[in-house]
């Protein structure tokens, strides 16, 4: 993927460039953390996150995703979730996920993803129970 006038998160940090909208930027990072836990991407680093000139975040390099671990990668930073994603995470049927992913993933990769999804649901629900829905869930 090529994005004109973009920078990596690594360069943004190095050059100390503040996001235009820190709150939205942090929420985008929450969704990255959720996604990386769901697919068990164990190679997320500041060099494979690209920020376009509108401050949209692009995740690149998922070559080390869909690991066979049933546990979550690291949910310590995952403290919020977008409401629609939260709803879909809870309601999507395993069979629907399997049907969509089976052309691309092996059965055991899908099985691990589904187990991680359940653990993400538990994690986010625990946060909601402890902090309240408005503190955890957000809407774009």
Language model features by range: what are they?
Residues 1-140:
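Phosphate/dinucleotide-binding and metal-coordinating scaffold of catalytic cores
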């Amino acid at each position: 993927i090529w994005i004109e006038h973009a920078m990596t998160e690594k360069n943004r940090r190095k050059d100390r460039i503040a996001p235009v909208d820190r709150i939205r930027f942090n929420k985008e990072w929450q969704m990255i953390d959720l996604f990386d836990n769901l697919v068990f991407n164990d190679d997320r680093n500041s060099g494979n996150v690209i920020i376009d000139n509108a401050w949209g975040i692009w995740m690149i390099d998922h070559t080390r995703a869909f690991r066979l671990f049933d546990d979550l990668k690291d949910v310590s930073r995952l403290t919020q979730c977008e409401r629609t994603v939260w709803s879909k995470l809870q309601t999507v049927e395993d069979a629907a996920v399997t049907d969509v992913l089976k052309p691309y993933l092996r059965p055991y990769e899908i099985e691990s993803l589904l187990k991680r999804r359940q653990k993400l649901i538990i994690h986010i629900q625990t946060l909601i129970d402890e902090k309240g829905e408005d503190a955890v869930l957000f809407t774009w």
